[in-house]
């Protein structure tokens, strides 16, 4: 049974050829961009955010909220089958990593119970460099 996610057919054999060095460092090596430097951390543009590596639609602006953490924050993915979760114990912390379900690229982390006034009490803290934004058509 094959992967039925929209971006699954776009998996690159050599990510270094299709991604810029800063994109590769985060998407494929699990890095993190510096807070407050990414393209989308404070954008208010309405639309759909997709995986920069494979194009799978991951998040909508309707679920984006201001967390003031320096990275785009969402309270839910577009659909649960668009992301997968991975325990992350790097840096001496216990966190839950978020990856694109179609191409297995690292996106960021999800945090629970921080007290944000959102429907899920979750904060998907996603690196801007991992995303592209398709603005909503008027």
Each model region followed by its residue ranges:
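Eukaryotic N-terminal low-complexity, Ser/Thr- and Lys/Arg-rich leader segments
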Residues: 1-3
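A short Gly-Trp-Pro
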Residues: 6-138
């Amino acid at each position: 049974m094959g992967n039925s996610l929209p971006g699954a057919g776009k998996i690159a054999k050599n990510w270094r050829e299709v991604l810029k060095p800063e994109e590769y460092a985060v998407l494929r090596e699990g890095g993190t961009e510096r807070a407050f430097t990414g393209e989308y951390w404070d954008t208010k543009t309405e639309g759909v955010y997709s995986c920069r590596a494979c194009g799978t639609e991951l998040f909508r602006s309707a679920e984006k909220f201001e967390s003031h953490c320096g990275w785009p924050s969402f309270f839910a993915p577009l659909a649960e089958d668009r992301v997968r979760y991975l325990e992350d114990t790097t840096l001496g912390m216990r966190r839950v990593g978020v990856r694109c379900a179609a191409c297995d690229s690292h996106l960021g982390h999800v945090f629970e119970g921080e007290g944000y006034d959102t429907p899920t009490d979750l904060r998907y803290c996603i690196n801007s460099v991992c995303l592209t934004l398709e603005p909503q058509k008027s």
